Amino acid sequence: MMAVPSRCSLGVAPLVAMVGGGQLARMTHQAAIALGQTLRVLATAADEPAAQVTPDVVIGSHTDLEDLRRVALGADALTFDHEHVPTELLDKLVAEGINVAPSPQALVHAQDKLVMRRRLAALGAAMPRFMALDSVDDLAEIDAFAQRLTGSKDAPMVVKAVRGGYDGRGVQMVRDSAHAREVASGYLVDGMPVLVEERVELRRELSALVARSPFGQGAAWPVVETVQRDGICVLVVAPALALADDLASAAQQLALRLAAELGVVGVFAVELFETADGALLVNELAMRPHNSGHWTMDGARTSQFEQHLRAVLDYPLGETDAVAPVTVMVNVLGAPQPPTLSVVTMDERLHHLFARMPDARVHLYDKVERPGRKVGHINFRGTDKDRKNPTKLRERAELAAHWLSHGQWTDGWDPHRAGDDVVEISLACGGRNDAQRQR
């Protein structure tokens, strides 16, 4: 199959094809509009977040070669909302002349944790100690691994499926060797190889987000702190506070070096552990816009979504400086129970949020709310005072996210109660009275 000439080569505005119709594709579409570009998405259904807003949609599967060909037809670049596309299919597209960015040779390092670990080891990147298991016959090796870690079979460890895990799926914390064998065997009997890793003593988790173009230009955003609960990122503080300049620079340089060594094109996230003794260890890699970069939509000169488009089209990359002393991003997750009837719709909750916190920058994905599902995020920009002590800014962000998820203010605030309309002051708006914005 011969590649169809790209739109750029015909003097037409660029077309980027993206595999996946989720929120990352939706927000990339928003960035494409501003740049005068077109984003075509491969979605599994018409009600996926990107498919609802993008006029150019292909309904199909990321595991079907013909569907991949359809979405890539005439595109200047084919890129990804997720990393689950089989690389053997991408190899065929590359052979047909399609510009796949990042390439399958790079993408496999974000798909396969064992491939990633072995390559990073060869590149000298620091990471948790690990061992690989391919068969239930190898389970006895876990005891010896635990002994090497701590001198005891009681060492706590982490068991990971080699492929397919995200947002905490496919990752389990285990108490000791016996627990590790039990968890690992569950994956192995299903034919999924596993990694067993040491559980390091953490100070916190960080993310170094960079972008790289085919020309080799790189750009790095400030290193951020990510807060995880139940394996899901719930909050990001940008930049990471109380992070020494030399450590922040080391994280950025590591991410840029890995992007170059792996041949990444596009946005590239390196998830890091900052250990209790001040070391940086690589945890995971992502080769696409990343949850830890959502703050850039309101807190940086160039958002990760615009930058991703620039990178895959080999445009000069944008500036990555922060535009506020600190930005807090908080994810809106579906609540365990539906909100009360008085605020049953997201639009009603959004109205009340803006009445109380007009400085909230809300990004909703138009997804059906389910427990724990990411349905949006909110960015709050802070001041120099907030950067010195971000507690109040973080509390406001979590308060706002809980309200959008649950329809309840955890501090007891009630917009319908007499008197409340005139007493609530937005903490981040110079003391202006929010009653001016109440209906």
From Swiss-Prot:
Pfam families according to UniProt: ATP-grasp, PurK_C, RS_preATP-grasp-like
All copies of domain ATP-grasp, residue ranges: 117-313
Keyword vocabulary terms for this entry: ATP-binding, Ligase, Nucleotide-binding, Purine biosynthesis
Binding site for ATP: 113, 160, 197-200, 205, 283-284
Pathway where it operates: Purine metabolism; IMP biosynthesis via de novo pathway; 5-amino-1-(5-phospho-D-ribosyl)imidazole-4-carboxylate from 5-amino-1-(5-phospho-D-ribosyl)imidazole (N5-CAIR route): step 1/2
Reaction(s) the record says it catalyses: 5-amino-1-(5-phospho-beta-D-ribosyl)imidazole + hydrogencarbonate + ATP = 5-carboxyamino-1-(5-phospho-D-ribosyl)imidazole + ADP + phosphate + 2 H(+)
HAMAP family: PurK
Its biological purpose: Catalyzes the ATP-dependent conversion of 5-aminoimidazole ribonucleotide (AIR) and HCO(3)(-) to N5-carboxyaminoimidazole ribonucleotide (N5-CAIR).
Self-association and partners: Homodimer.
Alphabetical list of NCBIfam families matching this protein: PRK06019.1-5, PRK06019.1-6, purK
Name of the featured protein: N5-carboxyaminoimidazole ribonucleotide synthase
Organism: Mycobacterium leprae (strain TN)
